[in-house]
Amino acid sequence: MANAKTIKVTLTRSPIGCQPKHKLCVKGLGLRKIGHTVEVEDTPSIRGMINRVNYLVRVEEN
């Protein structure tokens, strides 16, 4: 897993007022506060969560 491709995801907008499924995607990505950045593996399930909340996050590919 050391060679696994990773991506950095940063929460740029608050999920307050969003659909409950979108809030769960933000939580599933491990994001807590605005400006919080996490490094996650680049998998199809992670990409799906990012695509669902693309208006709330910024993505940086490594």
Swiss-Prot record:
This protein's GO CC annotations: cytosolic large ribosomal subunit
Entry GO MF terms: structural constituent of ribosome
InterPro entries listed in its UniProt record: Ribo_uL30_ferredoxin-like_sf, Ribosomal_uL30_bac-type, Ribosomal_uL30_ferredoxin-like
Top-rank taxon, per record: Bacteria
GO biological process: translation
Keywords: Ribonucleoprotein, Ribosomal protein
Family according to the record: Belongs to the universal ribosomal protein uL30 family.
Summary of subunit composition and partner proteins: Part of the 50S ribosomal subunit.
Protein name, per record: Large ribosomal subunit protein uL30
Gene: rpmD
